[in-house]
Structures are given as C-alpha cells and as structure tokens.
Amino acid sequence: MQHSERRVVFFDLDGTLHQQDMFGSFLRYLLRHLPLNLLLVVPMGPVILAGLAVSGRAARWPMSLLLWATTFGRREAVLKRLEAEFVGWFRHHVTAFPVVHARLTAYLTSTYADVWLITGSPQSLVEQVYRDTLWLPRVNLIASRTARRWGGWVLTLRCLGHEKVVQLEKKIGAPLRLYSGYSDSEQDNPLLGFCQHRWRVTPQGELQQLE
C-alpha cells in the first residue's frame, strides 16, 4: 500500500492520552523546588500575561520567558536532576485515559495508519515519562523543544495551535489530509480542521465526535 493511501491520524497528549498538563505541572514542580526564582517570575508575571493576551495562548515567547525565569541562574546539572525527579513524580501521579489509549492501540496495530503524536509538552519530558511504553517508539512524535540560553532554559519551539499544522506540514507536506484527530482542546481546531473524523476528548476521558 502506498503512503498516499494510508490513513494519517493525530493524537494530542495532555488532556487526551492523559489527564494532566505535563508542561504546566513541570513548571509548578520547578518553582516548588526553586522558590527563590519566584523573585524573578513574579515581577515578570504581568509581561507574560500581557503577552498571552496579545499574542494568543499558543504564543511561544511568553511561556519561554516563564520557563527562563523559572530556571535562570541554575546549573544545568541541577535542572537535569529536577527534571529526572519530576519525571518519576509525574509517572506516579499521571492519570491515563483508557478509551483514548484503546483507539491509539487500534491504529498502531493496524496495517494502514500512520500515527502522529503532536503535543505542546517538551519532547524531553514526553520521551522520559513514556520511555518504557510499547507505543511511544511506534508513533511519530512532534513536540515543543527546549534549549539553554542566557542562563536558563527557553522554548525554541512551542508546538501549540496553528504551529501544529506548520510542523506536520514540514513532515508530510501540504495540503494536509488527515483521516482522524483526537484532542481535548479548541486550540487544536486548526489541525482538526484537516481531519475527516474529529474527536473531542472530555475531561473524563470519553470521546465525543465533532461535526
């Protein structure tokens, strides 16, 4: 079967395959363990909120600024240790959505689907949290990316909203033609718009088909 005949399917991660917001949980975890960084985060709060209000909730730079303020002045070894500790904590507390995982498994065991996991959470966190799952090596992952800049961590890519469309087009070309999409968030509507079948994941992990 040629690739053009295959069914392309995408899944969001946070609120879709599991209940929690991984990146938001990570930022809160860092601030609990690096409380002095609140001295930088709090004064920048109005700038960050204004940036999200003006540029949109999917904008990269306000959340990049928040991540930088949260990690500024900390050695890389300290941040990596906290990241590893967070991964262990998150793996213990995460709530999976079995109904959505069943759909994911069905597509992965089929012979006709190419599955893309497209998430706003940082790639390093996704790969560590789900490192021992059977499904992660079998999906095509597109995620936000982080790097060290100016004494802290920043987001070099925030894979949210229309950026998901841009990144998937870079991988498989435009115009997009997707068979099915699964997400809990209206921020994914730009990508869901290219799907023949669109599914909204409820806060309880159930599926509702969109028109």
Predicted features, each with a name:
Residues 1-57:
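Active-site neighborhood of HAD-like aspartate-dependent phosphohydrolases
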Residues 50-53, 62-73:
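Helix-loop "lid/cap" segments that line or gate small-molecule binding pockets
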